[in-house]
Amino acid sequence: MDMEGLGARIKSQSAMEYLMTYGWAILAIAIVMVSLYSIGIFNLGNLKPTATPGSCQVVRTATQTSLAGQCNNLIPKYVGQFGGTSYIKTGTVGLPLGNNQRSISMWVYPKSANNGAFYTYGTYASQEMVGLLITSAGSSLYFQVYGTDWDTGMSLNLNSWNFVAVAYNPTGNTVTAYVNGNTQTHSLGSALNTALPGSDPSDVGKIMNGQGQYAIGYIANIQVYNASLDNTTIKAIYKEGIGGAPIAVQYLVAWWPLNGNANDYSGNNNQGNATNMVWNANWQSGYTQPTS
């Protein structure tokens, strides 16, 4: 009797029986793992150390402005969760007024295309405010000034993280908008005349000055600058990802990471006062670290 041949047949039969018994389970696990990877879970690009609240901040002295703390290669432990009645009233020190240059960037995870406001400041009057919203028509990024508003037409992905930014230059009254690395530029036709009201001048999660239009979803890492940042700088902010520190700190006037609190870490003390806020630690689904 060919014992070696018999042994080989037994091993082959055992292997086939094993595959028939467990093959479908292995296939199902593989499909689940691929699905989780596609939505950001188990994506090795997202597995970075988490930043504790306030781990990085801007320090201002008489001679310089600089970053201090753990500021590199981190993602936030928390993000701000806005449920339709949530908002944060903020300080206004240094916010660009009149027709001056300005730039605003942030990460947003809209759950509804409901005309909700991500961040706004100013007075609810013609050309006297600035803000970023999501439209109900097309889920696009909307630059509101309560006058010559601009629907950028650049759609935001619902139930997913998006980087959004605008840079305003009074030369030609031009606005450059950014969504996930894509860019468009537009002339408003009229100059801004941003002015602060006596109450409720600056809000995250709704329109300021006693108005509504509440955001529904998550918001993180709001940065406000008193300069019209160029494409290279804003794209560098985007590539840093959701936990990125400000880059052009000499122009920074407000920085709300929303990592577990509403504090301003720009050094300007524009602290936020939060209402109905949840600080969510389970935010990574739908986020992928930018690579280009």
Model-identified regions with their sequence ranges:
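Short, solvent-exposed beta-strand-to-loop segments that form ligand-recognition rims
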Residues: 179-202
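C-terminal juxtamembrane segment of a hydrophobic transmembrane alpha-helix
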Residues: 16-18, 22-51, 230
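Short hydrophobic/aromatic patches on beta-strands that form ligand-binding or substrate-lining surfaces
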Residues: 104-112, 164-166, 204, 219-225, ...
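Extracellular glycan-interaction patches encoded by glycine-rich segments
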Residues: 146-151, 197-220, 240-242
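Extracellular glycan-recognition modules
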Residues: 86-142, 158, 172-178, 209-214, ...
